[in-house]
């Protein structure tokens, strides 16, 4: 039995989605493990939830919420490790693994991951760098391009540059991409702040709306395409559990269609694909996962055009676990039951933590061999001894 600390809520536009995902994860984990719930408010304050909240959740008598009891406000101890990183009411709480069921900003973007690294506790999901890269759609697309993966043509700009050169950017978008266009914040999930535009008139308002959610906006060519989602897990070797499909009723799969109770979007746990298409998409999913250095789990999304062209769209490092989320359904269809999936994710977290803990961090604790020392001696190599920045990016 593992002591799991489950984080949910968060200071994010996807707060409510996180709560719904956490409900599924908590109910699954509590069947085999000890679970401590920590709810994070929209203001970013952490509160440990009473044991009765978990009991009621697991028996299905109440929905998950966040009780803000100041006596149960969480204190964090950097370096506290599994025995003392989390302190509640003056008492340290044992935590074998943290499961951050957090979506979007301050959850999937490397911020919480960095905090958990400083606490020195294992956690489910990707590390700091991989989380940050995956959350930043611009950086992810650049890395995928460098790795030779297909992505839709795109343009991006910062808010300050947009303010100074608005008309130039509009002209650039019309020349390089052409209408219709798809506008979205570089760092936001669940289609928050995203919109499709057909002409110039709504373009500027769409960009301004996207800037409400991030300092960088990404604009790409809008395509009518099938939306294919692949579920992956592992630290290496990686597993592609399958490919599902989302059939949106609107211009695109927006927040309401993803999470509204009255959503009319259809999801197919097994996408109807030809064998060659399935192999192509799952191979690209593995390469996209590897290119960003992902670990634990992720959902990689694709566009499949009528012409047969396939484009990597984006990646989600903490996929939804709501009642309509494809990730757990794809895994279950592949023969991985929810309890087994949770066991795999906890195992990956502890495995990755052990591997990182084995790395050296103290230069003085090691005696380097003379040949190694000379190879890294600036005086021995001259002023330009460090050539790492000039090395080309590896291609998959």
Swiss-Prot record:
**Cofactor details (free text):** Binds 2 magnesium or manganese ions per subunit.
Q: Which UniProt keywords apply?
A: ATP-binding, Cell shape, Cell wall biogenesis/degradation, Cytoplasm, Ligase, Magnesium, Manganese, Metal-binding, Nucleotide-binding, Peptidoglycan synthesis
Question: Where in or outside the cell is it found?
Answer: Cytoplasm
Tell me its EC number(s), please: 6.3.2.4
UniProt-annotated binding residues for Mg(2+) 1 = 301, 314
Assigned protein family:
Belongs to the D-alanine--D-alanine ligase family.
Q: What is this protein called?
A: D-alanine--D-alanine ligase
Q: What is the lineage of its organism?
A: Bacteria, Pseudomonadati, Spirochaetota, Spirochaetia, Spirochaetales
């Amino acid at each position: 039995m593992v002591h799991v600390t489950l984080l949910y809520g968060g200071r994010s536009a996807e707060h409510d989605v996180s709560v719904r995902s956490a409900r599924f994860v908590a109910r699954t984990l509590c069947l085999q493990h000890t679970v401590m719930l920590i709810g994070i408010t929209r203001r970013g304050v952490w509160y440990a939830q009473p044991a009765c909240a978990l009991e009621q959740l697991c028996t299905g008598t109440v929905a998950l919420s966040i009780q803000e009891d100041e006596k149960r406000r969480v204190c964090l101890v950097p370096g506290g490790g599994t025995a003392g990183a989390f302190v509640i009411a003056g008492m340290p709480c044992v935590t074998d693994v943290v499961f951050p069921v957090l979506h979007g900003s301050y959850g999937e973007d490397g911020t919480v991951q960095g905090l958990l690294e400083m606490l020195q506790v294992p956690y489910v999901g990707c590390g700091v760098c991989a989380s940050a890269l995956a959350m930043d759609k611009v950086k992810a697309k650049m890395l995928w391009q460098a790795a030779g993966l297909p992505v839709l043509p795109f343009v991006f700009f910062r808010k300050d540059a947009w303010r100074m050169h608005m008309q130039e950017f509009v002209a650039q978008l019309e020349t390089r991409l052409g209408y219709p266009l798809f506008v979205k914040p570089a760092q936001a999930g669940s289609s928050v702040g995203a919109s499709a535009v057909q002409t110039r008139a709504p373009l500027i308002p769409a960009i301004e709306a996207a800037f409400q959610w991030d300092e960088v906006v990404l604009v790409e060519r809008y395509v009518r395409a099938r939306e294919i989602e692949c579920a992956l897990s592992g630290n290496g070797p990686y597993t592609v559990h399958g490919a599902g499909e989302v059939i949106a009723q609107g211009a695109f799969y927006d927040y309401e269609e993803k999470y509204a109770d009255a959503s009319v979007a259809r999801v197919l746990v097994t996408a109807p694909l030809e064998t060659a298409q399935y192999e192509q998409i799952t191979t690209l999913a593995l390469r996209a996962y590897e290119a960003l250095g992902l670990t634990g789990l992720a959902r990689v999304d694709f566009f499949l055009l009528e012409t047969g062209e396939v484009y990597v769209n984006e990646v989600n490092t903490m996929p939804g676990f709501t009642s309509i989320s494809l990730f757990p359904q794809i895994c279950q269809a592949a023969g991985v039951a929810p309890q087994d999936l949770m066991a795999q994710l906890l195992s990956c977290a502890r495995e990755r933590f052990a591997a990182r803990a084995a790395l050296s961090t103290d230069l003085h604790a090691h005696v380097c061999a003379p040949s190694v020392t000379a190879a890294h001696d600036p005086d021995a190599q001259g002023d330009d001894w460090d050539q790492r920045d000039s090395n080309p990016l590896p291609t998959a």
